[in-house]
């Protein structure tokens, strides 16, 4: 789904927003078509998703206690014909029935397991796009070097 999406929307609300931000950081390096749905206010979420539709993929991340704001936004994506990749904890999650594909991971008041799953997803996509990723990182290395983005250890 992700490799052929016209646009990839990423959404996580409350504690899941950290996971969504992490996924967004790396997906921006892997894809040119990522939209990170910021959730500063309920109305803004829908404004950022106004163009979502068939051919798009919404990656929705939600764990107990499931935020209604996130559930409703993912429902909108589903209703507009976008595929939904749900990253959640169980088949009882309100995201599960909306999902085209569900990635289930244990969650007991810790983001460690969901973060590991997201890392595995990033690595799997990176493997599929190996040549493109190599070119992106070669380009990034040139930019980082030219503009002295990173400091160096004293012994380098």
Where are these regions (language model features)?
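A short, well-structured juxtamembrane/interface segment
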Residues: 1-4
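Glycine-rich phosphate-binding loops that contact phosphosugars or nucleotide phosphates
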Residues: 6-13, 17-116, 120-129
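Internal, active-site/partner-interface "lid" segment
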Residues: 128-156
């Amino acid at each position: 789904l992700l490799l052929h999406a016209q646009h990839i929307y990423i959404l996580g609300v409350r504690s899941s927003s950290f996971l969504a931000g992490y996924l967004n950081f790396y997906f921006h390096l892997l894809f040119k078509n990522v939209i990170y749905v910021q959730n500063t206010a309920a109305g803004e979420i829908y404004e950022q998703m106004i163009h979502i539709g068939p051919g798009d993929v919404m990656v929705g991340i939600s764990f107990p206690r499931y935020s209604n704001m996130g559930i409703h936004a993912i429902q909108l994506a589903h209703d507009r014909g976008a595929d939904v990749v749900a990253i959640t904890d169980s088949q009882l999650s309100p995201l599960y029935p909306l999902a085209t594909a569900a990635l289930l991971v244990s969650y007991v008041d810790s983001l460690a397991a969901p973060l590991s799953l997201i890392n595995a997803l990033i690595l799997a996509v990176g493997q599929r796009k190996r040549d493109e990723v190599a070119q992106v990182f070669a380009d990034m290395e040139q930019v980082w070097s030219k503009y002295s983005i990173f400091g160096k250890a004293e012994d380098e």
